[in-house]
């Protein structure tokens, strides 16, 4: 991942990418109040936002981080740092 990804939520403002969640979905968190998490599905005509609990967001991030470790991804350190900044 070469650059951070952001989305603009119509009510909660800027969201940043926390982790891919699979099946064309990603987990995003609010930029200024980091404890709101969304499962976002990008669609041709916009985005679908689903609020998810902290532990669900963390679970998706842990799964992604485990996959990066298993595949020895060059982005592993970046995802590890983002995980710690967001959840620890």
Predicted features along the sequence, with ranges:
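Short, compact, well-ordered microdomains
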Residues: 54-88
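Long, non-catalytic architectural segments outside compact domain cores
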Residues: 1-55
């Amino acid at each position: 991942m070469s650059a951070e990804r952001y989305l603009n939520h119509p009510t909660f403002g800027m969201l940043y990418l926390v982790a891919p969640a699979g099946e064309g979905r990603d987990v995003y968190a609010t930029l200024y109040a980091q404890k709101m998490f969304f499962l976002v599905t990008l669609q041709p005509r916009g985005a679908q936002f689903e609020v998810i609990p902290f532990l669900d967001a963390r679970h998706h991030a842990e799964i992604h981080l485990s996959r990066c470790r298993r595949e020895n991804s060059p982005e592993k350190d970046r995802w590890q740092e983002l995980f710690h900044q967001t959840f620890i």
